[in-house]
Amino acid sequence: MTIQMHKKVKITVLRTEYYQELAEQYAISYLGKCPFHQKGQVLYSDGINPPDGMCGVAWQVIAPMARQLSLGEPVQPSGTWLNDDRVGVFACPDGIRPVIFLLEAE
């Protein structure tokens, strides 16, 4: 039986967006940018557990990719759309105030 060691996964917030026109049409009046994450914020995961302070909805989206990276596997077939197999760029599913994350295997 082979035991596979997990790499640490660094999760960096690249951008936080807020689409005012969509918020005005579809959201409550006091909605603003994501309250969980700020540009430049860095979090770490073992690829299995969400880091402290991570938005649960965003984690549900990026967890499969974090797991792959923690196991040393690429998140996409080599050269498909990213130029480095050890990284991934993903967004949370909030269409009004999405957050863009960079995941890196360490």
Residue ranges and their predicted role:
Residues 63-106:
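Short, compact, well-ordered microdomains
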Residues 17, 47-53:
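Short, charged beta-turn/beta-strand-edge "cap" motif at the junction between a beta-strand
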Residues 24-49:
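Short, flexible N-terminal segments of the mature chain
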Residues 40, 51-70:
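Short, conserved turn/kink motifs that form compact alpha/beta structural patches or helix kinks used as
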Residues 18-23:
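Short N-terminal binding/cap micro-motifs at the start of the first secondary-structure element
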Residues 8-15:
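A short beta-strand micro-motif
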Residues 2-8, 36-39:
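A short, structured loop/turn motif at beta-sheet edges
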